[in-house]
UniProtKB/Swiss-Prot annotation:
Catalyzes the transfer of succinyl-CoA to arginine to produce N(2)-succinylarginine. Disulfide bonds: none annotated. InterPro entries: Acyl_CoA_acyltransferase, Arg_succinylTrfase_AstA/AruG, Arginine_N-succinylTrfase. The gene is astA. This is Arginine N-succinyltransferase. Belongs to the arginine N-succinyltransferase family. NCBIfam families: arg_catab_AOST, arg_catab_AstA, PRK10456.1. Keywords: Acyltransferase, Arginine metabolism, Transferase. It holds the Pfam family AstA. Gene3D superfamilies: 2.40.40.20, 3.40.630.30. GO terms for biological process: arginine catabolic process to glutamate; arginine catabolic process to succinate. Its EC number is 2.3.1.109. It catalyses: succinyl-CoA + L-arginine = N(2)-succinyl-L-arginine + CoA + H(+). Pathway: Amino-acid degradation; L-arginine degradation via AST pathway; L-glutamate and succinate from L-arginine: step 1/5.
């Protein structure tokens, strides 16, 4: 059975293995053991209530309960940009016009922005390619909404998610090559690594402070603004079906889109509800997949089950109850895994 659980110190070697499979571009999952250990420690201190809001972050892993294999990772930053500035570009427009010459040009322009300061962030989503099956990606991504719904007071009103931009298998980023490299004088992989290991001071020191006309970039770079890496397209679709939207903000390194949503408008958060759980043999039928989560802050768990999402009393097997760290009579959070398709 696949289970989402809180990260533990013993997970560091498994996270190193996952990091080695990302192919670069996932800034918050560098293949650096010291950085990953520090990330785990920060998550544990967050759960223990030892950190200020500006440093809080939760990390979860997807585990095969039978073998102990860690197949994926996902995380939530509680409030970005309160310690180190959180940069992105806002894609806007500057108009240059002359009535006398009968010239009017509306030019797409990149403006350096800190507009998402204080927002909660969905981040560090990565599923081992060998495990991309049977709803694991949905479980991994959406489990965070169950945690946010259960502990709403821990998070801010807006949630953002930076989507991985277009980078090839050799680490080549058209956006970086045309823009970032001119100011940072280093390869994309080097800048990405520095950022992922917490060495972010160089961004503020070297970033261009003035608006940038996108027409000055290569056509290849212009074409990838707001576009996602092919492997990230499913993750973008998942978030958009939950209510997230692209509002013309992009990553400063690879040009990937930043999606955002008001936390209380996220479908899985808005529609999740508490039901009583009982032990038994679940009813057979053509039921949809549903997320089921406990309400245990320190030992949070999420699993996928097929059940009636409208049920008032959820029947689970002993194995499912054990995976959730629950007992009969406890209340669990339930929501349909995917939004119902609208019919004409």
């Amino acid at each position: 059975m696949m289970v989402i659980r809180s990260v533990e110190r013993s997970d560091v070697s498994a996270l190193m293995q996952l990091a080695s499979k990302t192919g670069g571009g996932l800034t918050s999952l560098p293949a650096n053991e010291a950085t990953l250990s520090a990330r785990i420690e920060r998550a544990i201190k967050t759960w223990q209530g030892e950190l200020p809001k500006s440093e809080q972050g939760y990390v979860f892993v997807l585990e095969d309960s039978e073998t102990g294999t860690v197949a994926g990772i996902c995380a939530i930053e509680v409030a970005v940009g309160l310690n180190d500035p959180w940069y992105n570009y806002r894609v806007g427009t500057l108009v240059h016009a002359s009535k006398e010459l009968n010239v009017y040009n509306a030019l797409p322009t990149l403006f350096l922005s800190n507009d998402h300061t204080g927002s909660s962030e969905l981040c560090t989503l990565f599923l081992d390619p060998d495990w991309r099956k049977e709803g694991n990606g949905y479980l991994l991504s959406k489990s965070r909404f169950m945690f946010m719904a259960a502990f709403r007071d821990k998070f801010n009103d807006k949630v953002v998610a930076e989507m991985r931009g277009v980078i090839d298998e050799h680490g080549y980023s058209p956006f970086w090559q045309s823009l970032g490299k001119r100011f940072f004088s280093m390869d994309f992989s080097r800048a990405d690594f520095l950022c992922g290991t917490g060495q972010k001071a160089f961004i503020a020191e070297l970033m261009p402070k003035h608006p940038i006309y996108t027409h000055f970039l290569s056509q290849e770079a212009q074409d990838v603004i707001g576009q996602v890496h092919p492997q990230t397209a499913p993750a973008r679709a998942v978030l958009e079906k939950e209510g997230f939207r692209y509002r013309n903000y992009i990553d400063i390194f690879d040009g990937g889109p930043t999606l955002e949503c008001d936390i209380d408008r996220v479908r899985a958060i808005r529609k999740s509800r508490l039901v009583e759980v009982a032990e038994g043999q679940p009813a057979q039928g053509d039921f949809p997949a549903c997320l089921v989560a406990n309400e245990n802050y320190h030992h949070f768990r999420v699993v996928l089950v097929r059940t009636d999402p409208a049920t008032e009393r959820l029947i689970l097997t002993a194995a499912q109850l054990d995976a959730l760290k629950c007992h009969a009579g406890d209340r669990v959070r339930l929501v349909r895994l995917c939004a119902e398709e609208k019919t004409a």
